From Swiss-Prot:
Function: Potentially involved in docking of synaptic vesicles at presynaptic active zones.
Gene name as annotated: syx-4
Places the protein is found: Membrane
InterPro entries (UniProt xref): SNARE, Syntaxin, Syntaxin/epimorphin_CS, Syntaxin_N, T_SNARE_dom
Keyword Transmembrane: yes
Name assigned to this protein: Putative syntaxin-4
Pfam families (alphabetical): SNARE, Syntaxin
Lineage, opening ranks: Eukaryota, Metazoa, Ecdysozoa, Nematoda, Chromadorea
Amino acid sequence: MHQISGINAASPEKNNSKLADVSLQQFLANVDEIRHVLTTLSADRHAIYMEQVESLAAGCSDTAKCRKLNDHVDKFIAQARGIRRRLADASEELVQYPESRVGSGRARHEQIQMLIVSLEGIMSQFADDQASYKAEAAKKIAAYLRKQNIEVTDSEIDGAIENGSLFQLTRNINLGVAQKKALFDDMKNRATDIMILEKQIREVEELFVDMQLLVQSQGETVDRIETSVIRAEEYAEQAQQNVRQAVVLRRKNRKWKIVTCIALIVLLLVVVYLLSHFLGAIIPGWK
């Protein structure tokens, strides 16, 4: 009967161990899945870059092709936001697993930190690609306008695209030749493309702000945990010193008690000896 009770008592510990193993397995599976999505995201970034290079080289008179490129960028940003949300959720769950110098807690924090750094690197490269594509597209528009004897600066082009007045610059252009018509369509599509690109770049900037907050939050969590670990070590060391001091004081107290007892015994013997001699001197026959 006692054996059965013992087995039942041990069951919760085994169950907790199994739950911990399952939790760690789920965490690692989630990390692998996010890592796979990051690999796909990196490949998409490169594919978008190649599409932009092709667009700059071949022209953008085909509206459908420009729309396809913009849709690809929108899907990329949406996927990046989804990964960011998953990493934010994973970071919040880390509060349940305090970090230490070794162990699964440390491993969890390091895995999430590496994923955040990977996403940040991909998005940083993507932002550079978008800025470069925007600059090259603006140059294409400026080149077209100069061919039509319309001199404009890059800042004027940027301002005209942003406020929608770019087409006012082209109202006097003669489009009687089909080639000129194609060039104008290319410029018009690029201008529309740049306006969409501006919106996408702002979305990427917002995503970067969210990621910086996530990195900061992750860093603060790590700092708090590191501080707690350091304080715990300091408290443990102080406790050991207190124990050692208590042992030393206890030994000293015991030593002084023994010395005090011996001194009292010696003093008592001296008093008895002196009292015996004193009584022998005043009382005849006293020994």
